[in-house]
Amino acid sequence: MAEILSELSSREPIFHRPEFGTTRTEFERMTAEDFWEVGASGRIYSRQFVLDSLEERFSAPHRDTWVTKDFRCQKLAEDVYLLTYTLIQDEVRVTRRATIWQKTSDSWKIDYHQGTVVED
């Protein structure tokens, strides 16, 4: 399990690791066909919406200062894992994140992602 935790935590925060992708095609490969997300706002986002947003985000340079910590990994089913962690954005906003990852024959795919704002 330690190896899987290391592999998956290196990919988080998802969609913000240039080494794993910056183009729509790369993000399509990274996400399951039925991927969906619940944002920190509580809104539900479709795969299409997320892909459109990522395409816009990576069209211009950006400088996010994000820190991830407190990673945990739990096996949900054969080749399916829940990864949870804390994300600190620009030293101000703290969210708890959860991503469901599925191991495929040649890579990892994201089935689901959720962010929840931590209130003081």
Q: What would you call each of these model-derived segments?
A:
Residues 2-29, 34-120:
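A beta-strand edge to alpha-helix "cap/lid" segment located at domain peripheries
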